[in-house]
Amino acid sequence: MARPKKCRQLSSCVPCSLFKPNGIPSVELTHIQLAADEFEALELGDVQRLSQLDAAALMGISRQTFGYLLASARKKVATAITQGQVLRLPSKTDKDLS
């Protein structure tokens, strides 16, 4: 049985709901969902360039968990870009994670 998720502190605002290849209807493409905590990890680690330790402290999680989230988010973004898939971003209601 999996351990319950810790409550994570999220502050990033998502500017849009998805990214997709131009000229192809979304319904014809495979969708990849980026979770709210993965989006936050990308924002803190890659955009704000915080250390994993500092970013993890801001999110209220361990450094190792932050590393897993960042790796997962990077893989999803890279897969969507290289394979021409839709990347669905978290909605405002997804931020209420526990």
From Swiss-Prot:
Record Pfam families: DUF134
S-S bridge residues: none
InterPro entries per UniProt: UPF0251, WH-like_DNA-bd_sf
Family in the record: Belongs to the UPF0251 family.
Protein name: UPF0251 protein Sputcn32_0687
